[in-house]
């Protein structure tokens, strides 16, 4: 036997290298085979419910890192709730209708307008489901736990029926109406868009300053007067039917030198406009308030058949332009509102593809709307005063990335205005985890217009509306519920397979159809109505979930998207918000803080992370950032996170190895019998437990990460485990001192493994497989530990906080001695302490081997004053010299009792007593040489 064999060197097969990329899929299959998700739900039956409702990602393509961050965050929350006494099922979902899938099929050569619609929709459905399958595997590879066998998908018959019923209730309450308001119109998609489908980019446009000649000045202006107008959308002049001024804005009638004409502009803008138009020696002839100009009639710049009326509008400002805007009710929301109030014609001169129509005039007909500027300039002639190119923020179709226009077309709307206050009142009841999120959603609802819910596309849920022979729209409870039942049985494709009369209840009649003939609506619903109905299609209809949901967690862009549409439909139906809490996340940016895009080549695919690091590192990264704001991710950042993971893993490996001979049922030492330092570490760990439990409850992942890393680095590695080897390796295997420390080791190991499970389930299960004395076969079936409090806890914490200060001072003294070449390692030192009464009392209270805690070979607490050469602090001074004696071959301390023993071992008296007591046979035979 060799002397080193008398040491209790920790033994474990738990590998230092995790091998996550290859091991994770193996563990995940094991969990699936063991039906862990189902077993967890069974365990928690009857406990308080917690419903995190999954916002459905769009089923198209592989997931990106933003998807991963969001789904991992949800998984951490659901797992922590499941391990905290809640019944917390997770039903993942997918959004499957809409234009992107139509675009994919188009790129694949599918020609929608040349094939049977039902066959086309079948292709859309097949593609969508293939993407659901692809993304399901992507999410499962991240270690996300949920009911993957029974997700919700917005194209399933049961979901579509639930969506129809949401619409039906809104129709019954009078919230659905048809109108020809201007809507966001995407000529590139040939469809209306909702606000949530808009994104803004900078666009360079031609702006024109031109003049309308007064035709009837109403006794205020002469007919040789011209009202100066500014526009950034020249094509809309073809539909201009009025000029709008601000009632309380001051306007001036001016005549520049050398000009026969007189002009009206906003007084505040006269100086800048004079410079722009090249006017000199401008004479101000008169000043008017805007309201004095009301109902003056002007000529259209070129269309002699059209008169343009001067009207008042609150939207007019003097921030730019001339303080007067031309008004085309068919091409703008403000224009429409003031136009309708003043009985102006709602003219639309652009078709669904962005092509100018016949009513725009023969010079314009057939031109693309963006290309008409030269023609407009030619038609304006000498009425054009100036033109310039401007860059401004402009709305784009978020899918096609093309600019859009406002365009008045008959559409179906959900009236938000009818119950806006009810929605705002509900927002006040929701808990927002960021105050700015509440303000953002509140302001969006307060300021938004009615919701355009109709789309002129094919792949989506049909609007369950019929038309009588006289054109009357039919959307009554009887017909809508009948359609819902048909969809529930056959799916929404039945709408296109059957004639209108076969979609109506048997023997249905309507006074507007004396001949019994009906037509059906051909528009489909906005996809935001699809996902916005999920509270009904999923949360209400799934018995394991509770409505309203406890939490919605999505990206901050969903304040205008899913948070918004879900809120509107839920309040419209039931008068309550669909969620009790909202937690929003920022976007994942690259390592430089720039937006990720394929064109820049700075994207990171979750699959690449899994191959290089493992999903576990991506999960740990999610907790290492403040995801309420935009976050950064790169392979370098993930490499740093991987180092943190390695530190966590190897620390826990040390605990596993050094409790391998510890049976908690037999070897645990009662708390009251622990040393003071062990009690201190137990208390510090329980503080960590409380911090992490509280942070899980508040969804504060970064708090968990920081607290965990700090505990492992500072409390364990830099202190407790730093001197632990002197105990667990050196002392007798069954000695009280070793069992005391092992008791703390094991307690920390078991509980920290549970605390890590929601974040690092793969690693936690791997650790758990080495803990043979724990009852649960999977740590995921256990509960998070509760924080324990101890007697005299504050007193112990105060004592050891003071000792840590003392320890820091001692380490400075040792460092000085090391720099002066007095010692090499701290274990070579004899440290003499010159304490005052406070420190003396402290060292007595610590009641431990202080030399062991400081990792020095010898320590003397001296009486009397410190020598002049001592390193002095306010309460204590130190001197350092090399310890007397020789190095013990077993404990490596320098000790004056170190000597060669009769059994061929050069060891100190302390080690000799341990060896002679525990290894009598080896002592009798003598140890082998090193």
UniProtKB/Swiss-Prot annotation:
Give one GO biological process term.
Answer: isoleucyl-tRNA aminoacylation
- Cross-referenced Gene3D superfamilies: 1.10.730.20, HUPs, Ile-tRNA synthetase CP2 domain-like, Valyl/Leucyl/Isoleucyl-tRNA synthetase, editing domain
Catalysis: reaction(s): tRNA(Ile) + L-isoleucine + ATP = L-isoleucyl-tRNA(Ile) + AMP + diphosphate
Report the domain of life of the source organism.
Answer: Bacteria
InterPro entries per the record? Answer: aa-tRNA-synth_I_CS, aa-tRNA-synth_Ia, Anticodon_Ile_BEm, Ile-tRNA-ligase, Ile-tRNA-ligase_type1, Ile-tRNA_ligase, M/V/L/I-tRNA-synth_anticd-bd, Rossmann-like_a/b/a_fold
Q: Which Pfam families match?
A: Anticodon_1, tRNA-synt_1, zf-FPG_IleRS
Cofactor binding: number and manner:
Binds 1 zinc ion per subunit.
The UniProt entry's sequence similarity note says: Belongs to the class-I aminoacyl-tRNA synthetase family. IleS type 1 subfamily.
* Entry text on domains: IleRS has two distinct active sites: one for aminoacylation and one for editing. The misactivated valine is translocated from the active site to the editing site, which sterically excludes the correctly activated isoleucine. The single editing site contains two valyl binding pockets, one specific for each substrate (Val-AMP or Val-tRNA(Ile)).
Write down what this protein is called.
Answer: Isoleucine--tRNA ligase
Q: Give the classification, highest ranks.
A: Bacteria, Bacillati, Bacillota, Bacilli, Lactobacillales
Gene from which the chain derives: ileS
